[in-house]
Amino acid sequence: MPGYQLSASGQHLPSTQAAAPIVRSWERCASAAADLHDDPVALRHGDLQERLEQHACVLRAAQPEIETLAGMVASASSLVLLADASGVILQASGNTGFLQRADHVALRPGVSWAENHRGTNAIGTALIEAAALRVHGAEHFLRRNQILSCHAAPIRSPRGEILGVLDISGDAGRMHAYALSLASMCARQVANRVIEQAGERCLYLVFHKQASLLDSVERGLLLARTPGRVHTPQGAPFHAVLRQGGHARSLPA
């Protein structure tokens, strides 16, 4: 796909091997380029506080992962961001020096990073694609954002709805591709914690093929708000624990 031109100004993807989600995003942005602006779409302070209250459950569930990741990526001039399902950044933590650079491109709480506001970017494009993805350097549609390398993964509710996005963003010259795996793993853990929080009011089933991994990030969780029966695939036994609040009961494999 050499010289893949997408905008009236002649802007084109720098890579001939751009991932399909990036190409689709550039095509969407090219058709709406006249509506994309470098100026951020930001909430007023009062509106941001109201949104933080609306998303208190996800913020509470994500806090351990945000703190852990922020400590891990601080030395790499990076930030950990939590955005809501519309793309508005709710929280940013990490390298204090990079926080100042990030502010220059409006990578801060209260600003919408929806794709129709900020062009191709990990938060907004992950929401549209409903999948974890990386947007590195010049893959960003807006040139001012091309200093960034961003890695975002959706956080899903027990019903599969997207509750928000966990993102690791940093200097494009220093970020590593494994940041996407970190973001994806932590987004799953946040989703599990949302279920556990709901489990204070109802039952949830924790399962894994190995009993020793029932408390790992790779475990599976099923939430039951009303009494019911859980069916398992034939020939696929697993170890399970039925939990409610702080109580647990082992189930036979």
Language-model features and meaning:
Residues 138-142, 209:
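Short, solvent-exposed loop/turn elements at beta->coil junctions and helix N-caps
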Residues 138-139, 147-152, 250-253:
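PAS-family sensory/regulatory modules and their coupling/dimerization elements
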Residues 1-116, 121-134, 147, 156-226:
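Intrinsically disordered, low-complexity terminal regulatory regions
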Residues 217-221, 228-229, 239, 252:
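C-terminal catalytic or substrate-handling cores of phosphate/nucleotide-
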Residues 94, 226-238:
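PAS/LOV sensory domain surfaces, especially short acidic/polar patches at coil-to-helix junctions
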Residues 123-124, 241-253:
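Terminal output helix/cap of sensory domains in signal transduction proteins
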